[in-house]
Regions:
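Conserved, well-structured ligand/cofactor-binding cores
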Residues: 1-462
Length: 462
């Protein structure tokens, strides 16, 4: 960088040139220079969580008489600007950096200090004022919990609730639609389509419950543990008051963790939440795969439903339309499962008093939350709510399904039923015709016993 485009900043290691328009200072620039690893940056939600903590810390430190009001109010104002999204391009530090996330903590400290200095009319120290009573070692773990809690509450859970509701509403419209059930992808006893979708809905509902079960632990914060969990350099009331301020600002019941040593050295709650996100991802893959199979064809596949045609499916085959939303859903699920593996490894990386893969956990956890939320709404609104059932195809398949003979087992026995099924398969005839010839049951009795709609109710046919 030329001298005209830079200014000189100084930290404990000496002087360094920084872009003249940058709100950050020397420590951020060192991180930019040290870690040109990827194009990945920590999410906006995470940066805002740190800013939220800085704002709360300044308010509490003023209240405790530790921070001069002129400086404290300027810090609060600067942090709010970050929360308002006004300076998003001033956080350039790579995800792959120091494992404590110190570079990102100092990036936020420096930007706030720069903004606050203008309002205060005097120098604001990134370390002594903005970072007062704090350490990167408690700020970053706390920010993981704060950002994940807020994004889960405001984005993911509403999206999953929406998906479950859409599935349930769709199921209610399909109560009378009977189709061939399948196990091992092979023809089985009939089911109502509403029953099939009811299974999907419960998967999502259970996923919501699993995520909600993690939230009380996610609301427990590391803030106040400072460097190693002892709370050195933080006022005894600091942790509780910061949590109270965060609760007032967000309506989320944040509290100090029962052990800051656990908060700093382990990331078990993040690992737990990621695991529950993985369960949701697995559920979404199952739903997406069912939709793709049901939509397959339109002529040489199952052809049970028709998904909305959203875009041309091929650059070479005219007229081809693909199940793009289920495919996108499956890819999101694969990414979330991969993120969970990464978070699992990162969660193991807490040697003694500090986990040293915190930025990686933050990035992957928040990505999983974001993409699951977004794709859940797409799956609901662009696939499930609008698919059309091809009842003619369903009826043809039902009429030719020899497995319906299972309902006769209590009357004629398994072996006789197997003979009938094999004959129907071999001759390609309806099961009712073959059973009428091979049993003493009348056609009228058989049509009643083998009515697909009745068979979906379970029980013993008599």
């Amino acid at each position: 960088m030329s001298d005209k485009k830079t200014r000189v900043e100084k930290d404990s290691m000496g002087e360094l040139r920084v872009p003249v328009a940058a709100l950050y200072a020397a420590q951020t620039q060192r991180a930019v220079d040290n870690f040109p690893v990827s194009s990945l940056r920590l999410p906006k939600a995470f940066i805002q969580a740190i800013a939220r903590i800085k704002k709360a810390a300044a308010l509490v430190n003023m209240e405790l008489g530790l921070l001069e009001p002129n400086l404290g109010k300027a810090i609060v104002d600067a942090a709010q600007k970050i929360l308002d999204g006004k300076h998003d391009d001033h956080f350039p530090v790579d995800v792959f950096q120091t494992g404590s996330g110190t570079s990102t903590n100092m990036n936020v400290n420096e930007v706030i200090a720069s903004l606050a200095a203008g309002r205060a009319g005097e120098k604001v120290s990134a370390n002594d004022h903005v970072n007062m009573g704090q350490s990167s070692n408690d700020v970053i773990p706390a920010a993981i919990h704060v950002s994940a809690a807020l994004e889960t509450d405001r984005s993911l859970l509403p999206a999953l609730e929406h998906l479950a509701e859409i599935i349930e509403k769709k199921a209610a419209t399909l109560e009378s639609v009977v189709k061939t059930g399948r196990t091992h992808l092979m023809d089985a006893m009939p089911v109502r389509m509403s029953q099939e979708l009811g299974g999907w809905a419960l998967q999502i509902r259970n996923g919501i419950d699993r995520i909600r079960a993690v939230l009380p632990r996610l609301h427990r914060l590391a803030q106040g543990g400072t460097a190693v969990g002892t709370g050195i350099n933080a006022h005894p009331s600091f942790a509780a008051r910061v949590a109270e301020v965060l609760e007032q600002e967000t309506a989320v019941p944040f509290k100090p963790n029962a052990s800051f040593f656990e908060s700093l050295s382990a990331q078990d709650t993040a690992v737990e939440l990621s695991g529950q996100l993985k369960v949701v991802a697995v559920s979404l893959i199952k739903i997406a795969n069912d939709l793709r199979w049901m939509n397959s064809g339109p002529l040489a596949g199952l052809g049970e439903i028709e998904l909305p045609a959203l875009q041309p499916g091929s650059s070479i085959m005219p007229g081809k339309v693909n199940p793009v939303i289920p495919e996108a859903t499956a890819m999101v699920a694969a990414q979330v499962i991969g993120n969970d593996a990464t978070i699992t490894v990162a969660g193991q990386s807490g040697s003694f008093q500090l986990n040293v893969m915190l930025p990686l956990i933050a990035y992957n956890l928040l990505q999983s939350i974001e993409i699951l939320a977004n794709v859940s709404r797409l799956l609901a609104d662009k696939a499930i709510t609008a698919f059309v059932v091809r009842e003619d195809n369903l009826q043809v398949a039902l009429a030719r399904n020899p497995i319906l003979v299972t309902a006769l087992n209590p009357l004629i026995g398994y072996m006789k039923a197997a003979e009938i099924a094999k004959a129907a398969y071999k001759e390609g005839r309806p099961i009712v015709e073959v059973a009428a010839e091979m049993t003493g049951l009348s056609r009228e009795e058989l049509e009643k016993l083998l009515d697909p709609a009745v068979l979906t109710k379970g029980g013993i046919q008599e």
